[in-house]
Amino acid sequence: MELKVFSNRAEASDAAAQFIAANVRSILTNASELLVAVPGGSTPRACLTLLGAQDLPWQNIAVTLTDERDVPRDHPDSNFGLLCDTLFAGQALMKRFVPLNEDAVSRTQHLPLVTLLGMGEDGHFASIFPDAAERDILLDAGAEHLLASVTTGSSPHPRFTLTMARLARAVAAGLLIFGDGKRSVLEVPGSLPVSHLVQAMDDRLTVFWAP
């Protein structure tokens, strides 16, 4: 894991967007297409807007979510709605969106993956929560399931998430976090989901942090 520290959140968001774009360009020198997975929530909004403004060969880039709430797409809590306001409001192509269902995830599992991730104060990433009933399966990098439903008391809505078995295959992953609390959670070794992510990704994970 590489930790990059920035003085403000705008700089961290821009650096994370540049990181994703640079890895996309690098992969597409040897691959005809790839998959970019991004999170919901408030933290990545600026980063996703900046990423959507990048001059990339978007026709060769499939876009999916790391996780989603089981709500209609036009619901205020829908992560898809965030994509519409950010990535798809820029140059990214909505027709290349890969929904979080078993068939779509299976069809794209062969594609090289670059992912942007967020993290909660409880150490969760995507929708892999510490209290999830499915925690062991979600964190098993060798599991067969690439997508799973999540039962957690941390969310008012049922959720779906890409599992560690899919996310750990990423060529590169950027973790964008803000605040001293989240940095402390990240840096303290333990059994939280993010600790498993750091171990599984090793030097393929770059953390972008700002106060």
Where are these regions (language model features)?
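Conserved phosphate- and dinucleotide-binding cores of soluble alpha/beta proteins
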Residues: 71-211
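N-terminal active-site beta-alpha-beta segment that forms phosphate/nucleotide-binding
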Residues: 2-105, 110
